[in-house]
Swiss-Prot record:
Pathway: One-carbon metabolism; tetrahydrofolate interconversion; Amino-acid biosynthesis; glycine biosynthesis; glycine from L-serine: step 1/1. GO terms for molecular function: glycine hydroxymethyltransferase activity; pyridoxal phosphate binding. (6S)-5,6,7,8-tetrahydrofolate binds at residues 133, 137-139. This is Serine hydroxymethyltransferase. The gene is glyA. The record marks 241 as: Plays an important role in substrate specificity. It is an enzyme of class 2 (transferase). Catalyzes the reversible interconversion of serine and glycine with tetrahydrofolate (THF) serving as the one-carbon carrier. This reaction serves as the major source of one-carbon groups required for the biosynthesis of purines, thymidylate, methionine, and other important biomolecules. Also exhibits THF-independent aldolase activity toward beta-hydroxyamino acids, producing glycine and aldehydes, via a retro-aldol mechanism. Its main location: cytoplasm. The modification N6-(pyridoxal phosphate)lysine is found at residue 242. Transmembrane segments: none annotated. Its EC number is 2.1.2.1.
Length: 438
């Protein structure tokens, strides 16, 4: 073997066999530190969850090497016979999980799945209705800073000021007045049950499509803890992470064959090129997990834990928007503690409790300050936390917020936060992740 060939072989051996720690210790270190953070912190961000080892293995597989533009059986590249199997499994499992006739599992994100529906069903300048961001909607539901608000004429509906529940009379009135081509139901910070049947009645009355973005509650729908929108909506979108407990990505469901064709064309070639086959493999694994009987128990526990957390926070003098929760999340009004969302998020973070500042309906504060925080129970429930643990977590949150109120400064109360941090580390240590103790 020549010296050149020997050098090439040695280089190949390193390329295929050296570990991440050997090749890139900086990235390895960041990942190791992030694992430590996740292990020792209580994650209450409602849009986050923890995937199984099986999902991690699928998403970290050699499927990342394969380009697969197109759909199973109709690829623009050769060598797709095995990724076809993966995508077909993901599609069939998604259809079974949600009782849908058609599923597209290729969207790379929640934003892209919603963009694909708009591309399929709307023209620039068309009118659609969506939940106002300040009432719990999402950027892609018509926010003026988002493509959805720039390309279309958006009519937003909201919640009532007295009880913070969806104002269905307002939805009906706005629909009759504006004759939208599409009505979008679903949100990111609404803690009550959605009346899909009523939304469909309104949509039918004005000749609109009904689109449901169930990204936050898809796992609860799959687990039987929230009514399914699939029988009512013309098209449903959902992310595959959040309460569904899969990899980060999106999915589109419909029972209408004509809409399915439009959706497929909108996703590819309209919006995306080659799908992320390693992510689709992770989706397929997560769907298989969600089809198991134990996932129904998980979904029930998510809701039970959320209700327990909300009641515990109320017992400590905090207000919960709409008075409580029927799903996995809640908005906490911090004004009784004279705190802002920005200050509370930082103080809780110092105590190893992760959440996000969030506007509340009719919030007087600026969007990057806010009067509230959003809390969710999917990740903690995945770790094994039950009602007792979430009651303890509610008490710890109140302890930090009371300390923040006494300190009356952005720096918070260091002594209180350190004491709570130690309790958090002790609690999380009883529920290890990925086989690691401590």
């Amino acid at each position: 073997m020549s010296q050149a060939n020997a050098a090439t072989k040695a280089s190949s051996d390193v390329f295929f066999n050296a570990s991440l720690e050997d090749i890139d210790p900086e990235i390895f270190g960041a990942i190791r530190n992030e694992l430590g953070r996740q292990r020792h912190e209580i994650g209450l961000i409602a849009s986050e969850n923890i995937v199984s080892r099986a999902v991690l293995e699928a998403q970290g597989s050699i499927l990342t090497n394969k380009y697969a533009e197109g759909y199973p059986g109709k690829r623009y590249y050769g060598g797709g016979q095995y990724v076809d199997v993966v995508e077909e499994l993901a599609i069939e499992r998604a259809k079974k999980l949600f009782g849908a006739e058609f599923a597209n599992v290729q969207p790379n994100s929640g934003s892209q799945m919603n963009q694909a529906v708009f591309l399929a069903l709307l023209q620039p300048g068309d009118t659609f209705m969506g939940l106002d961001l300040n009432s719990g909607g999402h950027l892609t539901h018509g926010s003026p800073v988002n493509m959805s608000g720039k390309w279309f004429n958006v009519v937003s509906y909201g919640v009532r000021k007295d009880d913070h529940l969806l104002d269905m009379d307002e939805v009906a009135r706005l629909a009759r007045e504006n004759k939208p081509k599409l009505i979008l139901a679903g949100g990111t910070a609404y803690s009550r049950i959605w009346d899909w049947k009523r939304f469909r009645e309104i949509a039918d009355e004005v000749g609109a499509y009904l689109m449901v973005d169930m990204a936050h509650i898809a796992g609860l729908v799959a687990g039987g803890q929230h009514p399914s929108p699939v029988p009512h909506a013309h098209v449903c979108t959902t992310t595959t992470h959040k309460s569904l407990r899969g990899p980060r990505g999106g999915m589109i469901l419909t029972n209408d064959a004509d809409i399915a064709k439009k959706i497929n064309s909108a996703v590819f070639p309209g919006l995306q090129g080659g799908p992320l086959m390693h992510v689709i493999a992770g989706k397929a694994v997560a769907f298989a997990e969600a089809l198991k009987p134990e996932f129904k128990l998980y979904a029930k526990n998510v809701v039970d834990n959320a209700r327990a957390l909300a009641e515990e926070l109320k017992s400590h003098g905090l207000d919960i928007v709409s008075g409580g929760t029927d799903n996995h999340l809640m908005l906490v009004d911090l004004r009784p503690k004279n705190a802002t969302g920005k200050r509370a998020e930082a103080a809780l973070g110092r105590a190893n409790i992760t959440c996000n500042k969030n506007g509340i309906p009719f919030d007087p504060e600026k969007p990057f300050v806010t009067s509230g925080v959003r809390l969710g129970t999917p990740a903690g429930t995945t770790r094994g936390f039950g009602v007792a643990e979430f009651k303890e977590i509610g008490s710890l949150i109140a302890e930090v917020l009371d300390g923040l109120k006494v300190a009356n400064s952005d720096e918070g109360n260091a002594a209180v936060e350190q004491a709570v941090k130690e309790k958090v580390i002790a609690l999380t240590g009883r529920f290890p992740m990925y086989g690691y103790q401590g």
